[in-house]
Amino acid sequence: MQPFADERTDDVFNGRHRKDVPESIARRAARQIDILLAATKLEDCRIAGRGRIAKRQNTEPPTFCCNTEGRWWLTFEWQFGKAVNIKLEDTG
């Protein structure tokens, strides 16, 4: 099980600049990913200031999401007590 679903999310978390992700979004997403990786229960994933974790409809395995800002979302799966396949998505 990999913590990140794609290279963009790995780059953002590790502080590598991406032209396709605004700097303010990258900083916020990195903080949120840190919370997801530290969580041991799904309830721990509530992001300070945003708070809501939503289960996405019709996904297998079950996928959850939380808003980073505006059109930017973090999606992830919850397996064996940890967030995996975390992905920063631009829905715009």
Give names to the regions the model predicted.
Residues 1-32:
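Arg/Lys-rich, positively charged N-terminal/basic patches that mediate binding to nucleic acids
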Residues 40-65:
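A short, surface-exposed loop/turn module that caps and links secondary-structure elements
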Residues 57, 64-92:
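Enriched for short, Lys/Arg-rich terminal
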Residues 21, 41, 48, 87-88:
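Short linear functional motifs in flexible/disordered or boundary regions
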Residues 8, 17, 49-52, 84-87:
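Glycine-rich, flexible loop/turn motifs
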Residues 36:
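Short basic (Lys/Arg) and small-residue
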